[in-house]
UniProtKB/Swiss-Prot annotation:
This is ATP phosphoribosyltransferase. The keyword Nucleotide-binding applies. It is found in: Cytoplasm. SUPFAM superfamilies: Periplasmic binding protein-like II. Belongs to the ATP phosphoribosyltransferase family. Short subfamily. Keywords: Amino-acid biosynthesis, ATP-binding, Cytoplasm, Glycosyltransferase, Histidine biosynthesis, Nucleotide-binding, Transferase. Catalyzes the condensation of ATP and 5-phosphoribose 1-diphosphate to form N'-(5'-phosphoribosyl)-ATP (PR-ATP). Has a crucial role in the pathway because the rate of histidine biosynthesis seems to be controlled primarily by regulation of HisG enzymatic activity. One of its GO terms (biological process) is L-histidine biosynthetic process. Heteromultimer composed of HisG and HisZ subunits. Pfam families: HisG (PF01634). Lacks the C-terminal regulatory region which is replaced by HisZ.
Length: 223
């Protein structure tokens, strides 16, 4: 098949981003007949023969787009910041879709006086998956920290003495409260953005641009 005639590929992750992307696609007249939560397929067709979806880990979406395995993708700001810190290639981010909204926060045990520790100049151990965002946040505030990278179960770290604080995504705060933690500081608001491979935009722009425009219109109507 002529690469220029091949379907466009949109990289998505399972879960909240996939679920909140579906209304945007529907608004653009595109339906996805299979749900990745119930299907084992990693490549999903759509009602538009010119577009297919690939299902990857959230942290891998920017990599698939950067290297051209996907023409475009949808990823959270948190993921994009961490990706940019590790990769030299830049991704075109034409639209903040305002989906999968949450906050990146500093959280501690409810009995830990975070403000007092900061005021006293204590060096804090901070566990997080979002190393770059955490490092930039504490550097800007002049707080001395040692960053410990974890990949999951972040709430456990302060409870077992691994860390004084965590930096993690928070939606309702229910998981923090259930584990005796409290958010004490916002790092940044998070939402998901449309990202596009820059080479594809040049070589397949006539097909990509209408889809980008459709996402923009859909996000504005649904917002």
């Amino acid at each position: 098949m002529n690469p220029a005639a091949a379907p466009l590929t949109l990289a998505l992750s399972k879960g909240r981003i996939f679920e909140e992307t579906m209304p945007l696609l529907a608004e653009a007249g595109i339906e996805v007949p299979e749900n990745p939560e119930s299907s084992r397929k990693l490549i999903l067709p759509t009602s538009d023969p010119g577009l297919r979806l690939i299902i990857v880990r959230a942290s891998d979406v920017p990599t698939y787009v950067q290297y051209g395995a996907a023409d475009l993708g949808i990823a959270g700001k948190d993921v994009l910041i961490e990706h940019a810190a590790q990769q030299s290639g830049r991704l075109y981010q034409p639209i903040d879709l305002n989906i999968a909204k949450c906050r990146l926060c500093v959280a501690v045990r409810q009995d830990f006086d975070y403000q007092a520790a900061v005021h006293q100049g204590a060096r804090l151990r901070v566990a997080t998956k979002y190393v770059q965002s955490a490092r930039e946040h504490f550097a800007a505030k002049g707080v001395h920290v040692d960053i410990i990278k974890l990949y999951g179960s972040m709430e456990l770290a302060p409870l077992v003495g691994l860390a004084d604080a965590i930096v993690d995504l928070v939606s309702t705060g229910g998981t923090l409260r259930a584990n005796g933690l409290a958010a004490v500081e916002d790092v940044m608001p998070i939402s998901s953005r449309l990202i596009v491979n820059q080479a594809a935009l040049k070589t397949r722009g006539a097909r990509l641009q209408p889809l980008i425009d459709a996402f923009r219109r859909a996000s504005e109507r649904i917002a």
